[in-house]
Amino acid sequence: MSVAEMFSDFVANLAIGNTETISTRYGELTSALNKQFRDTESKTANTLQVGSFGRKTGINGISDLDMLYIMPKTKWGDYNKAGGQLSLLQDAKEAILKRYPTTKVKVDRLVVTVTYTNFHVEVQPVFEQGDQSYLYPDTKNGGSWKTTKPPAEMTAVADMDVQKNANLRPLCKMA
C-alpha cells in the first residue's frame, strides 16, 4: 500500500459515522422551533448548521454540535427589550421540550443545550441582519446582543479548501 493510499485510509477513518443521526436531530430541532415561531414544521428552513460539522471539518466521535435558528424578523420587538435575551432562550427551550419532553434541555448564557446520548447540540436563536451577520442573545449582565458571521467563515473554509486541492478540510480534521 502506498503512502497516498494509507493517508486516504487515515482520512476516511476520521469521517463522521453518525451523520444520519446528527442530521435527523438537527431536522427535529428545526421543526420544533419552526412549529413554535412560524407555524410550519419544516426540518430545513430557517436553520444553519455551524461549527465544525457545518464547516465539514468535524471528525468521528464529534460530540459538540452547533446550530443557528433564524428567528422571524417580526419577533424582534418581542425580544429586543430588558430581559428579552433570556426570554428568547427560554422560549426556544420550551419549543424543544415539546418535541423532546424527556431529553435534557437547558438554557446556558448564549444557547439552549440539548443533550442526547452520544452528543449535544447547542441551539442559538438569532436574528438575521442585512449583511449576512446574525444577532444572538447574551444573557450576561442583564442581556445584550452580539454579532456572529458564520456564513462568511464557512465560505472562507470552502474557498481555501478549493485553493488547496481539497486538502484543507482533511488537515483540519487531523488538528
Which sequence ranges carry the predicted segments?
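Residue-level recognition of short, structured coil/turn motifs
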Residues: R38, L97, P101-T102
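A gly/proline- and charged-residue-enriched helix-loop-helix capping module
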Residues: L86-R99
